[in-house]
Amino acid sequence: MTPPAAVRRNEIIGVLSLAVDFAIGQAVGYGLRSAIGSMAIAREMGCDEALAAESYYQGLLQASGCNAETDVLNALFGDEILLRQDVARIERADPTQMLALVLSHVGAGREGPAPQAFGDAAYSAIMGAANRVFHSHCETASKLAERLGLSSNVQRNLAQTHERWDGAGLPDKLVGTAIALPVRIATVVHHCIRLGGFLPVEDVITRVQSRSGAAYDPAVVDAVLSRLPVLLIDMDDAAAWESAICDFPPDDVSLSEAELDIACEVLADFIDIKSPAIAGHSRAVSALAEAAGQVAKVTAQERALLRRGGLLHDLGYAAIPGPQRLSHAMSEQGRLHPYYAQRLLHRAPGLAPIGTLIAEHHERLDGSGFHRASRGPDLSTLSRLLSAADCYQTLTETRGRREALTPKQAAQTLREDSRAGSLCGQAVAAVLEAAGQTGRRKKVAHVAGLTAREIEILQALARGGANKYIARELELSPKTVDNHIQSIYAKLGVKTRGGATLFALERGLLQPGKT
Protein backbone atom coordinates (compact mmCIF):
# COMPACT_ATOMS: atom_id res chain seq x y z
CA MET A 1 0.00 0.00 0.00
CA THR A 2 1.10 3.56 -0.68
CA PRO A 3 1.56 5.41 2.63
CA PRO A 4 -1.34 7.85 3.12
CA ALA A 5 -0.78 11.59 3.31
CA ALA A 6 -0.30 13.09 6.75
CA VAL A 7 -3.52 14.13 8.47
CA ARG A 8 -3.76 17.57 10.05
CA ARG A 9 -5.74 18.23 13.20
CA ASN A 10 -7.94 20.78 11.49
CA GLU A 11 -8.86 18.22 8.83
CA ILE A 12 -10.24 15.97 11.58
CA ILE A 13 -12.02 18.96 13.13
CA GLY A 14 -13.36 19.88 9.69
CA VAL A 15 -14.74 16.36 9.21
CA LEU A 16 -16.39 16.60 12.64
CA SER A 17 -17.92 19.94 11.65
CA LEU A 18 -19.32 18.47 8.42
CA ALA A 19 -20.79 15.54 10.37
CA VAL A 20 -22.40 18.04 12.76
CA ASP A 21 -23.98 19.81 9.76
CA PHE A 22 -25.68 16.52 8.88
CA ALA A 23 -26.76 15.96 12.48
CA ILE A 24 -28.41 19.38 12.88
CA GLY A 25 -30.05 19.34 9.46
CA GLN A 26 -28.03 22.17 7.94
CA ALA A 27 -26.41 22.36 4.51
CA VAL A 28 -23.02 20.66 4.42
CA GLY A 29 -20.44 23.40 4.91
CA TYR A 30 -22.59 25.41 7.32
CA GLY A 31 -20.09 25.04 10.17
CA LEU A 32 -17.18 25.89 7.88
CA ARG A 33 -18.92 29.06 6.72
CA SER A 34 -19.69 29.95 10.33
CA ALA A 35 -16.02 29.53 11.24
CA ILE A 36 -14.88 31.78 8.40
CA GLY A 37 -17.50 34.39 9.27
CA SER A 38 -16.82 34.31 13.01
CA MET A 39 -13.10 34.81 12.48
CA ALA A 40 -13.77 37.72 10.09
CA ILE A 41 -16.12 39.43 12.56
CA ALA A 42 -13.61 39.00 15.40
CA ARG A 43 -10.97 40.76 13.31
CA GLU A 44 -13.49 43.43 12.30
CA MET A 45 -14.11 44.11 16.00
CA GLY A 46 -10.39 44.57 16.64
CA CYS A 47 -9.69 41.22 18.29
CA ASP A 48 -6.14 39.89 18.30
CA GLU A 49 -5.32 36.71 16.39
CA ALA A 50 -5.73 34.53 19.49
CA LEU A 51 -9.34 35.66 19.93
CA ALA A 52 -9.93 35.41 16.19
CA ALA A 53 -8.74 31.78 16.33
CA GLU A 54 -11.07 31.08 19.28
CA SER A 55 -13.94 32.58 17.28
CA TYR A 56 -13.03 30.32 14.36
CA TYR A 57 -13.18 27.18 16.51
CA GLN A 58 -16.41 28.30 18.17
CA GLY A 59 -17.97 28.80 14.76
CA LEU A 60 -16.70 25.42 13.60
CA LEU A 61 -17.64 23.33 16.64
CA GLN A 62 -20.47 25.20 18.35
CA ALA A 63 -22.95 22.36 17.78
CA SER A 64 -20.47 19.48 18.14
CA GLY A 65 -22.13 18.21 21.32
CA CYS A 66 -25.48 17.83 19.54
CA ASN A 67 -25.57 14.01 19.62
CA ALA A 68 -25.43 13.77 23.43
CA GLU A 69 -28.67 12.35 24.85
CA THR A 70 -30.30 12.18 21.43
CA ASP A 71 -32.29 9.23 22.79
CA VAL A 72 -34.15 11.69 25.04
CA LEU A 73 -35.08 13.85 22.05
CA ASN A 74 -36.12 10.76 20.07
CA ALA A 75 -38.40 9.58 22.87
CA LEU A 76 -40.06 12.99 23.19
CA PHE A 77 -40.04 14.32 19.64
CA GLY A 78 -39.15 11.57 17.16
CA ASP A 79 -36.90 12.80 14.32
CA GLU A 80 -34.26 14.86 16.12
CA ILE A 81 -32.77 16.29 12.91
CA LEU A 82 -36.13 17.70 11.83
CA LEU A 83 -36.61 19.04 15.37
CA ARG A 84 -33.25 20.85 15.23
CA GLN A 85 -34.14 22.37 11.88
CA ASP A 86 -37.41 23.70 13.30
CA VAL A 87 -35.81 24.99 16.52
CA ALA A 88 -33.42 27.06 14.40
CA ARG A 89 -36.39 28.88 12.85
CA ILE A 90 -37.97 30.17 16.07
CA GLU A 91 -37.16 32.35 19.08
CA ARG A 92 -36.57 29.82 21.85
CA ALA A 93 -37.17 32.42 24.57
CA ASP A 94 -40.71 33.04 23.28
CA PRO A 95 -43.08 30.69 25.17
CA THR A 96 -45.74 30.90 22.45
CA GLN A 97 -43.33 29.82 19.72
CA MET A 98 -41.85 27.10 21.91
CA LEU A 99 -45.28 25.71 22.82
CA ALA A 100 -46.25 25.58 19.14
CA LEU A 101 -43.00 23.78 18.34
CA VAL A 102 -43.45 21.27 21.15
CA LEU A 103 -47.05 20.54 20.14
CA SER A 104 -45.98 19.96 16.54
CA HIS A 105 -43.31 17.43 17.52
CA VAL A 106 -44.11 15.88 20.90
CA GLY A 107 -45.25 12.28 20.74
CA ALA A 108 -43.67 11.69 17.34
CA GLY A 109 -41.29 9.21 18.97
CA ARG A 110 -44.24 7.13 20.21
CA GLU A 111 -47.02 5.15 18.63
CA GLY A 112 -50.45 6.80 18.41
CA PRO A 113 -51.59 10.35 17.69
CA ALA A 114 -49.68 13.38 18.98
CA PRO A 115 -51.42 15.41 21.68
CA GLN A 116 -53.24 18.58 20.66
CA ALA A 117 -52.66 20.18 24.05
CA PHE A 118 -51.40 19.38 27.51
CA GLY A 119 -51.11 21.01 30.91
CA ASP A 120 -48.46 23.27 32.36
CA ALA A 121 -46.90 20.41 34.32
CA ALA A 122 -46.41 18.27 31.21
CA TYR A 123 -44.98 21.20 29.25
CA SER A 124 -42.65 22.01 32.15
CA ALA A 125 -41.44 18.40 32.32
CA ILE A 126 -40.77 18.30 28.58
CA MET A 127 -38.88 21.60 28.64
CA GLY A 128 -36.93 20.45 31.69
CA ALA A 129 -35.81 17.34 29.83
CA ALA A 130 -34.90 19.42 26.76
CA ASN A 131 -32.87 21.83 28.90
CA ARG A 132 -30.95 18.92 30.45
CA VAL A 133 -30.10 17.83 26.91
CA PHE A 134 -28.81 21.33 26.08
CA HIS A 135 -26.62 21.20 29.22
CA SER A 136 -25.26 17.89 27.96
CA HIS A 137 -24.55 19.39 24.53
CA CYS A 138 -22.37 22.11 26.05
CA GLU A 139 -20.36 19.74 28.22
CA THR A 140 -19.94 17.17 25.45
CA ALA A 141 -18.67 19.76 22.96
CA SER A 142 -16.15 20.97 25.52
CA LYS A 143 -14.93 17.44 26.28
CA LEU A 144 -14.54 16.58 22.59
CA ALA A 145 -12.45 19.74 22.10
CA GLU A 146 -10.23 18.73 25.01
CA ARG A 147 -9.61 15.32 23.47
CA LEU A 148 -8.78 16.96 20.14
CA GLY A 149 -6.04 18.99 21.83
CA LEU A 150 -7.72 22.39 21.56
CA SER A 151 -6.97 25.09 24.12
CA SER A 152 -8.64 25.51 27.49
CA ASN A 153 -10.19 28.75 26.20
CA VAL A 154 -11.81 26.91 23.29
CA GLN A 155 -13.10 24.28 25.73
CA ARG A 156 -14.52 27.00 28.01
CA ASN A 157 -16.16 28.75 25.06
CA LEU A 158 -17.90 25.60 23.86
CA ALA A 159 -19.25 25.03 27.37
CA GLN A 160 -20.98 28.44 27.06
CA THR A 161 -22.61 27.75 23.69
CA HIS A 162 -26.21 28.15 24.87
CA GLU A 163 -25.68 31.25 27.03
CA ARG A 164 -27.56 34.48 26.19
CA TRP A 165 -26.60 38.14 26.55
CA ASP A 166 -29.58 38.77 28.88
CA GLY A 167 -28.72 35.90 31.24
CA ALA A 168 -31.63 33.70 30.19
CA GLY A 169 -29.37 31.04 28.64
CA LEU A 170 -27.70 27.95 30.02
CA PRO A 171 -25.91 26.14 31.53
CA ASP A 172 -24.82 28.91 33.92
CA LYS A 173 -27.10 31.87 33.04
CA LEU A 174 -24.09 34.09 32.36
CA VAL A 175 -24.90 37.74 31.63
CA GLY A 176 -23.37 40.15 29.11
CA THR A 177 -19.59 40.24 28.90
CA ALA A 178 -19.30 37.31 31.32
CA ILE A 179 -19.91 35.30 28.15
CA ALA A 180 -16.69 34.93 26.16
CA LEU A 181 -16.57 37.21 23.10
CA PRO A 182 -15.95 34.33 20.64
CA VAL A 183 -19.20 32.75 21.88
CA ARG A 184 -21.13 35.99 21.43
CA ILE A 185 -19.74 36.38 17.91
CA ALA A 186 -20.27 32.81 16.72
CA THR A 187 -23.83 32.72 18.10
CA VAL A 188 -24.91 35.65 15.92
CA VAL A 189 -22.97 34.44 12.87
CA HIS A 190 -24.49 30.96 13.15
CA HIS A 191 -27.98 32.38 13.38
CA CYS A 192 -27.53 34.69 10.40
CA ILE A 193 -26.25 31.90 8.18
CA ARG A 194 -29.10 29.61 9.26
CA LEU A 195 -31.73 32.27 8.64
CA GLY A 196 -30.10 33.18 5.33
CA GLY A 197 -30.87 29.66 4.15
CA PHE A 198 -34.61 30.34 4.02
CA LEU A 199 -35.22 34.10 4.47
CA PRO A 200 -34.44 37.17 2.34
CA VAL A 201 -31.72 39.48 3.68
CA GLU A 202 -34.24 42.07 4.93
CA ASP A 203 -35.98 39.48 7.09
CA VAL A 204 -32.66 38.19 8.45
CA ILE A 205 -31.81 41.74 9.54
CA THR A 206 -35.20 42.15 11.23
CA ARG A 207 -34.90 38.81 13.09
CA VAL A 208 -31.37 39.50 14.30
CA GLN A 209 -32.12 43.07 15.36
CA SER A 210 -35.10 41.82 17.36
CA ARG A 211 -32.71 39.72 19.47
CA SER A 212 -30.16 42.50 20.00
CA GLY A 213 -29.82 43.21 23.71
CA ALA A 214 -31.74 40.03 24.55
CA ALA A 215 -30.09 36.90 23.16
CA TYR A 216 -27.31 38.82 21.42
CA ASP A 217 -24.61 41.35 22.28
CA PRO A 218 -25.67 44.62 20.53
CA ALA A 219 -22.08 45.43 19.51
CA VAL A 220 -21.74 42.03 17.86
CA VAL A 221 -25.07 42.46 16.09
CA ASP A 222 -23.90 45.79 14.65
CA ALA A 223 -20.62 44.26 13.45
CA VAL A 224 -22.31 41.23 11.90
CA LEU A 225 -25.05 43.19 10.14
CA SER A 226 -22.45 45.54 8.66
CA ARG A 227 -20.93 42.50 6.89
CA LEU A 228 -24.13 40.52 6.37
CA PRO A 229 -24.09 40.46 2.54
CA VAL A 230 -20.59 38.94 2.65
CA LEU A 231 -21.57 36.40 5.33
CA LEU A 232 -24.56 35.26 3.29
CA ILE A 233 -22.69 34.73 0.02
CA ASP A 234 -23.50 31.17 -1.00
CA MET A 235 -20.47 28.90 -0.85
CA ASP A 236 -20.48 25.19 -1.64
CA ASP A 237 -18.88 22.79 0.81
CA ALA A 238 -15.76 22.29 -1.35
CA ALA A 239 -15.04 26.02 -1.44
CA ALA A 240 -15.84 26.35 2.26
CA TRP A 241 -13.44 23.48 3.05
CA GLU A 242 -10.68 25.07 1.01
CA SER A 243 -11.11 28.42 2.75
CA ALA A 244 -11.73 27.21 6.32
CA ILE A 245 -9.48 24.15 6.54
CA CYS A 246 -6.75 24.51 3.92
CA ASP A 247 -6.11 28.25 4.27
CA PHE A 248 -6.48 28.66 8.03
CA PRO A 249 -4.75 28.55 11.06
CA PRO A 250 -1.18 28.90 12.04
CA ASP A 251 -1.76 26.67 15.07
CA ASP A 252 -2.76 23.68 12.92
CA VAL A 253 -0.54 20.61 13.36
CA SER A 254 0.09 17.30 11.64
CA LEU A 255 -0.99 14.32 13.73
CA SER A 256 1.25 11.45 14.73
CA GLU A 257 -0.08 7.91 14.24
CA ALA A 258 -1.11 7.74 17.90
CA GLU A 259 -2.76 11.17 17.73
CA LEU A 260 -4.64 10.15 14.59
CA ASP A 261 -6.01 7.10 16.42
CA ILE A 262 -7.23 9.34 19.26
CA ALA A 263 -8.83 11.73 16.76
CA CYS A 264 -10.62 8.83 15.06
CA GLU A 265 -11.87 7.70 18.48
CA VAL A 266 -13.32 11.18 19.01
CA LEU A 267 -15.25 10.92 15.74
CA ALA A 268 -16.40 7.40 16.68
CA ASP A 269 -17.64 8.57 20.06
CA PHE A 270 -19.46 11.50 18.44
CA ILE A 271 -21.56 8.91 16.59
CA ASP A 272 -21.86 6.26 19.29
CA ILE A 273 -23.02 8.74 21.95
CA LYS A 274 -26.14 9.26 19.83
CA SER A 275 -27.86 6.22 21.33
CA PRO A 276 -27.26 3.97 24.35
CA ALA A 277 -27.99 1.04 22.02
CA ILE A 278 -24.78 1.63 20.06
CA ALA A 279 -22.49 3.13 22.71
CA GLY A 280 -19.08 1.51 22.23
CA HIS A 281 -20.03 -0.25 18.98
CA SER A 282 -17.46 1.50 16.80
CA ARG A 283 -14.60 0.84 19.21
CA ALA A 284 -15.60 -2.82 19.43
CA VAL A 285 -15.71 -3.21 15.63
CA SER A 286 -12.34 -1.48 15.42
CA ALA A 287 -10.70 -3.86 17.90
CA LEU A 288 -12.21 -6.92 16.23
CA ALA A 289 -11.34 -5.82 12.68
CA GLU A 290 -7.74 -5.08 13.65
CA ALA A 291 -7.42 -8.44 15.42
CA ALA A 292 -8.89 -10.19 12.37
CA GLY A 293 -6.30 -8.43 10.23
CA GLN A 294 -3.60 -9.86 12.49
CA VAL A 295 -5.04 -13.36 12.00
CA ALA A 296 -5.21 -12.79 8.23
CA LYS A 297 -1.58 -11.63 8.23
CA VAL A 298 -2.19 -8.28 6.55
CA THR A 299 0.51 -5.61 6.88
CA ALA A 300 0.84 -3.24 9.84
CA GLN A 301 -0.30 -0.37 7.61
CA GLU A 302 -3.38 -2.36 6.58
CA ARG A 303 -4.15 -3.21 10.22
CA ALA A 304 -4.04 0.50 11.04
CA LEU A 305 -6.49 1.11 8.20
CA LEU A 306 -8.79 -1.60 9.59
CA ARG A 307 -8.52 -0.12 13.08
CA ARG A 308 -9.48 3.35 11.88
CA GLY A 309 -12.07 2.01 9.45
CA GLY A 310 -13.74 0.22 12.35
CA LEU A 311 -13.80 3.43 14.36
CA LEU A 312 -15.30 5.49 11.53
CA HIS A 313 -17.47 2.96 9.68
CA ASP A 314 -20.73 4.42 11.02
CA LEU A 315 -19.76 8.10 10.75
CA GLY A 316 -22.41 8.57 8.06
CA TYR A 317 -25.14 7.88 10.61
CA ALA A 318 -24.77 11.54 11.57
CA ALA A 319 -27.15 12.19 8.66
CA ILE A 320 -29.75 9.63 9.77
CA PRO A 321 -32.39 10.35 12.44
CA GLY A 322 -33.16 7.74 14.97
CA PRO A 323 -32.58 5.07 15.81
CA GLN A 324 -36.18 4.32 16.78
CA ARG A 325 -38.96 3.07 14.53
CA LEU A 326 -37.51 4.20 11.22
CA SER A 327 -40.07 4.32 8.45
CA HIS A 328 -39.39 2.43 5.22
CA ALA A 329 -38.19 5.66 3.61
CA MET A 330 -35.83 6.37 6.49
CA SER A 331 -34.56 2.79 6.39
CA GLU A 332 -33.67 3.35 2.75
CA GLN A 333 -31.91 6.58 3.71
CA GLY A 334 -30.03 4.64 6.38
CA ARG A 335 -28.57 2.43 3.66
CA LEU A 336 -26.71 5.51 2.42
CA HIS A 337 -24.67 5.98 5.59
CA PRO A 338 -21.53 4.41 4.02
CA TYR A 339 -21.82 6.97 1.20
CA TYR A 340 -22.18 9.86 3.65
CA ALA A 341 -19.13 8.67 5.59
CA GLN A 342 -17.02 8.42 2.44
CA ARG A 343 -18.14 11.88 1.37
CA LEU A 344 -17.05 13.33 4.72
CA LEU A 345 -13.66 11.64 4.78
CA HIS A 346 -12.67 12.24 1.16
CA ARG A 347 -12.24 15.95 1.85
CA ALA A 348 -8.89 15.16 3.52
CA PRO A 349 -6.33 13.25 1.39
CA GLY A 350 -4.94 11.42 4.44
CA LEU A 351 -8.42 10.20 5.42
CA ALA A 352 -9.57 9.26 1.90
CA PRO A 353 -8.30 5.63 2.12
CA ILE A 354 -10.42 5.15 5.25
CA GLY A 355 -13.41 6.57 3.38
CA THR A 356 -12.86 4.18 0.47
CA LEU A 357 -12.72 1.21 2.86
CA ILE A 358 -15.80 2.05 4.89
CA ALA A 359 -17.85 2.85 1.79
CA GLU A 360 -17.82 -0.94 1.21
CA HIS A 361 -18.50 -2.25 4.71
CA HIS A 362 -22.12 -3.18 3.91
CA GLU A 363 -21.37 -4.61 0.46
CA ARG A 364 -21.66 -8.38 -0.02
CA LEU A 365 -19.93 -10.83 -2.36
CA ASP A 366 -23.22 -11.77 -4.04
CA GLY A 367 -24.25 -8.16 -4.73
CA SER A 368 -26.95 -8.15 -2.04
CA GLY A 369 -25.33 -5.38 0.00
CA PHE A 370 -25.44 -1.60 -0.17
CA HIS A 371 -25.05 1.17 -1.18
CA ARG A 372 -23.54 0.25 -4.57
CA ALA A 373 -24.50 -3.45 -4.69
CA SER A 374 -20.86 -4.26 -5.48
CA ARG A 375 -19.83 -7.89 -5.99
CA GLY A 376 -16.95 -10.07 -4.91
CA PRO A 377 -14.29 -9.12 -7.47
CA ASP A 378 -14.75 -5.44 -6.58
CA LEU A 379 -14.32 -5.92 -2.82
CA SER A 380 -10.88 -5.74 -1.22
CA THR A 381 -9.57 -8.10 1.44
CA LEU A 382 -9.79 -5.30 4.00
CA SER A 383 -13.42 -4.46 3.18
CA ARG A 384 -14.31 -8.16 3.52
CA LEU A 385 -12.67 -8.28 6.94
CA LEU A 386 -14.38 -5.09 8.09
CA SER A 387 -17.76 -6.33 6.84
CA ALA A 388 -17.45 -9.60 8.74
CA ALA A 389 -16.26 -7.83 11.90
CA ASP A 390 -19.18 -5.39 11.79
CA CYS A 391 -21.67 -8.22 11.20
CA TYR A 392 -20.36 -10.28 14.12
CA GLN A 393 -20.26 -7.34 16.52
CA THR A 394 -23.76 -6.15 15.55
CA LEU A 395 -25.24 -9.62 16.01
CA THR A 396 -23.85 -9.79 19.56
CA GLU A 397 -25.54 -6.49 20.48
CA THR A 398 -29.16 -5.89 21.44
CA ARG A 399 -30.76 -3.76 18.72
CA GLY A 400 -34.31 -2.49 19.17
CA ARG A 401 -36.55 -5.49 19.74
CA ARG A 402 -33.88 -7.99 18.66
CA GLU A 403 -31.99 -9.56 21.53
CA ALA A 404 -28.24 -10.01 21.28
CA LEU A 405 -27.05 -13.36 19.98
CA THR A 406 -24.51 -15.36 21.94
CA PRO A 407 -21.01 -15.50 20.41
CA LYS A 408 -21.76 -19.08 19.35
CA GLN A 409 -25.02 -18.07 17.65
CA ALA A 410 -23.37 -15.10 15.94
CA ALA A 411 -20.57 -17.35 14.68
CA GLN A 412 -23.12 -19.79 13.26
CA THR A 413 -24.94 -16.95 11.48
CA LEU A 414 -21.70 -15.70 9.91
CA ARG A 415 -20.82 -19.20 8.71
CA GLU A 416 -24.27 -19.55 7.15
CA ASP A 417 -23.85 -16.19 5.39
CA SER A 418 -20.47 -17.36 4.12
CA ARG A 419 -21.92 -20.62 2.75
CA ALA A 420 -24.72 -18.63 1.11
CA GLY A 421 -22.13 -16.53 -0.74
CA SER A 422 -22.78 -13.28 1.09
CA LEU A 423 -19.70 -12.97 3.31
CA CYS A 424 -16.15 -14.02 2.47
CA GLY A 425 -15.30 -17.37 4.09
CA GLN A 426 -11.69 -16.43 4.80
CA ALA A 427 -12.74 -13.12 6.35
CA VAL A 428 -15.35 -14.88 8.50
CA ALA A 429 -12.78 -17.42 9.67
CA ALA A 430 -10.33 -14.63 10.60
CA VAL A 431 -13.00 -12.67 12.48
CA LEU A 432 -14.24 -15.70 14.40
CA GLU A 433 -10.71 -16.65 15.39
CA ALA A 434 -10.06 -13.06 16.44
CA ALA A 435 -13.33 -12.92 18.39
CA GLY A 436 -11.97 -15.65 20.63
CA GLN A 437 -8.71 -13.75 21.19
CA THR A 438 -9.73 -10.16 21.80
CA GLY A 439 -10.88 -10.61 25.39
CA ARG A 440 -13.61 -8.03 24.88
CA ARG A 441 -15.59 -9.44 27.82
CA LYS A 442 -12.78 -9.03 30.34
CA LYS A 443 -13.46 -7.55 33.75
CA VAL A 444 -13.32 -3.77 33.78
CA ALA A 445 -10.52 -2.27 35.87
CA HIS A 446 -11.26 0.49 38.36
CA VAL A 447 -10.63 3.97 36.96
CA ALA A 448 -10.80 7.54 38.28
CA GLY A 449 -11.23 6.27 41.82
CA LEU A 450 -14.62 4.74 41.00
CA THR A 451 -15.78 1.82 43.10
CA ALA A 452 -17.07 -1.36 41.47
CA ARG A 453 -20.64 -0.28 42.30
CA GLU A 454 -20.06 3.17 40.80
CA ILE A 455 -18.75 1.60 37.59
CA GLU A 456 -21.93 -0.51 37.39
CA ILE A 457 -24.06 2.61 37.83
CA LEU A 458 -21.98 4.58 35.31
CA GLN A 459 -22.47 1.80 32.75
CA ALA A 460 -26.23 1.73 33.37
CA LEU A 461 -26.41 5.53 33.19
CA ALA A 462 -24.53 5.58 29.88
CA ARG A 463 -26.98 2.99 28.53
CA GLY A 464 -29.75 5.52 29.06
CA GLY A 465 -31.18 4.17 32.30
CA ALA A 466 -33.27 6.50 34.45
CA ASN A 467 -32.50 6.50 38.18
CA LYS A 468 -35.56 4.38 39.01
CA TYR A 469 -34.63 1.84 36.34
CA ILE A 470 -31.03 1.63 37.57
CA ALA A 471 -32.28 1.25 41.15
CA ARG A 472 -34.54 -1.63 40.15
CA GLU A 473 -31.83 -3.30 38.06
CA LEU A 474 -29.21 -3.12 40.82
CA GLU A 475 -31.66 -3.61 43.73
CA LEU A 476 -30.89 -0.23 45.28
CA SER A 477 -33.08 2.65 46.40
CA PRO A 478 -33.46 5.57 43.94
CA LYS A 479 -31.91 7.87 46.57
CA THR A 480 -28.84 5.64 46.82
CA VAL A 481 -28.50 5.64 43.03
CA ASP A 482 -28.77 9.43 42.96
CA ASN A 483 -26.06 9.72 45.63
CA HIS A 484 -23.80 7.41 43.62
CA ILE A 485 -24.40 9.44 40.44
CA GLN A 486 -23.46 12.67 42.19
CA SER A 487 -20.28 10.98 43.47
CA ILE A 488 -19.50 9.69 39.96
CA TYR A 489 -19.96 13.13 38.42
CA ALA A 490 -17.67 14.68 41.05
CA LYS A 491 -14.94 12.08 40.47
CA LEU A 492 -15.14 12.41 36.68
CA GLY A 493 -15.38 16.21 36.72
CA VAL A 494 -18.61 16.21 34.69
CA LYS A 495 -22.15 17.49 35.24
CA THR A 496 -24.25 15.60 32.69
CA ARG A 497 -25.03 12.11 31.40
CA GLY A 498 -23.44 13.09 28.09
CA GLY A 499 -20.16 13.93 29.81
CA ALA A 500 -20.26 10.72 31.83
CA THR A 501 -21.00 8.64 28.73
CA LEU A 502 -18.05 10.16 26.87
CA PHE A 503 -15.79 9.26 29.80
CA ALA A 504 -17.07 5.68 29.80
CA LEU A 505 -16.55 5.38 26.04
CA GLU A 506 -13.04 6.79 26.20
CA ARG A 507 -12.05 4.37 28.98
CA GLY A 508 -13.60 1.32 27.29
CA LEU A 509 -16.10 0.78 30.09
CA LEU A 510 -19.10 0.04 27.85
CA GLN A 511 -20.06 -3.25 26.25
CA PRO A 512 -22.19 -2.15 23.28
CA GLY A 513 -25.75 -3.34 23.00
CA LYS A 514 -26.06 -4.49 26.59
CA THR A 515 -29.30 -3.51 28.32
Q: Where are the predicted features?
A:
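Metal-dependent catalytic cores of enzymes that make or break cyclic nucleotides
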Residues: 3-447
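Short, Lys/Arg-enriched C-terminal cap helix and immediately downstream tail that follows
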Residues: 346, 490-505
